[in-house]
Amino acid sequence: MARAAISDRDDVALVVATDDEDIAAHAREAGCPAVMTDSALATGSGRALAAALLFAEGPRFVVNLQGDSPFQPEGALGAVLAALESGAEVATPVIALDWESLDALREHKLLSPFSGTTCVRAPNGRALWFSKAILPAIRDEDRLRATDGLSPVWRHVGLYGYQLEALRRFEACAPTMLER
């Protein structure tokens, strides 16, 4: 997915950042450079920043694809890069769930409650809140199902893009009580 999304760009480097030698070896076997990062890093964003800082000339943008979310909607990576290039400091795509996908997410959460992240958005599309709970609560769901093909639930796809300085600021912040 990542290779296809950047195939026409010579200004983008694809690098796997991991603290697991097996993952690094697999990436290298697949022809992708890999860098080892400190296992004490708590987040993928921290790992992505550590990898970016290994390069003599730091990148303008850093994109972090969660290792547990390798399958992305077509165009997601390109959209993140386009948002960053047009001035966004942070870009992270979400997709509107149709009712069947929402039902599947609900079923999956019965077995794995902390999997999958949903997003509540402002009318302008800006993310207001991310949650492991399915948000928003849906009133009069039967009526909505009958009239709308899409549910009001947006799912985060596990892709984060940052201007390098925005990522530095983000990683300098301590986790909040709600993140723990």
Where is each model-derived feature located?
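N-terminal glycine-rich phosphate-binding loop and ensuing alpha1 helix
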Residues: 1-18
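Conserved core of the sugar-phosphate nucleotidyltransferase
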Residues: 72-173
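Short phosphate-binding loop-to-helix
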Residues: 21-82
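Short, high-confidence coil segments that cap the C-terminus of an alpha-helix
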Residues: 11, 57-59, 86-90
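Hydrophobic/aromatic residues located in beta-strands of well-ordered beta-sheets
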Residues: 14-16, 62, 127
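Donor nucleotide-sugar recognition loop
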Residues: 174-180
